[in-house]
Amino acid sequence: MMNVATIGSGVIVDRMIEAMRLDGRYNLYCVYSRTQERAKEFADKHGIQKYYTDMEEMLNDENVDIVYVASPNSLHYKQSKMALEHKKYVINEKPFTPTLKECNELFEIAKKNGVYIFEAITNVHLPNYQIIKENLSNCGDIKMVQCNFSQYSSKYQRYKDHIQTNAFDPNFNGVALMDINVYNLHFVTGLFGKPKDVHYFKNVGYNGIDTSGIIIMEYPDFIATCTGAKDCSSP
């Protein structure tokens, strides 16, 4: 059984802890949060005995095998890099990193230190997705692929009231492309590979972030569109 350290205290971490316990192969060893009050509160909530407020101290704990990174998007690269450099396995929440350069660097660091890093993306691992993949050749001549993941954010009203939250903060990469449309991108590229060209058309909020947008992906014989929104919902 491998010992897991979690970084972050949002709802997604609650769900990951629940999933790991259901799986039975992981021991929830410790949690990390920036403040002692929040770290203790989150640890107590999940019955985890150990908590840290110092990242370096946590990573120096020899009992930690895996680090699950679920902090704001802009921190994924830095925190994953620190964990890999301490020879910890890493499960990094989506979006993996803001840039391809950072992504490739993390893979190189993992390889150098003899550990692995994974992106915690879910949809491409679901049984129904595998069925689609296995039966794609039976679908005939594909000309259009349409994906839509639009979910009105519970924090959008606060954003409209000019109350800043991480979910809509450009400093934390709180944008629709990375938060929502990333699922559509995985869905399409997992089935069809890299497109020959990509265009992104977005609705931009008052602070410069995209609150929704449409990606058009051009393949040799068809077009795929990916719609992702945090400012409205789809059926």
Residue ranges and their predicted role:
Residues 185-235:
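Contiguous beta-strand/loop segments that form the cofactor/metal-binding neighborhood of enzyme cores
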Residues 105-122, 141-144:
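Rossmann-fold dehydrogenase core element
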Residues 6, 16, 46-109:
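Beta-loop-alpha module in the N-terminal Rossmann-like domain of NAD(P)-dependent dehydrogenases
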Residues 26-30, 65-67, 117, 174:
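Short active-site oxyanion
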Residues 1-46:
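N-terminal Rossmann-like dinucleotide-binding module
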Residues 35, 124-125, 148-154, 202-206, ...:
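Glycine-rich beta-alpha junction loops
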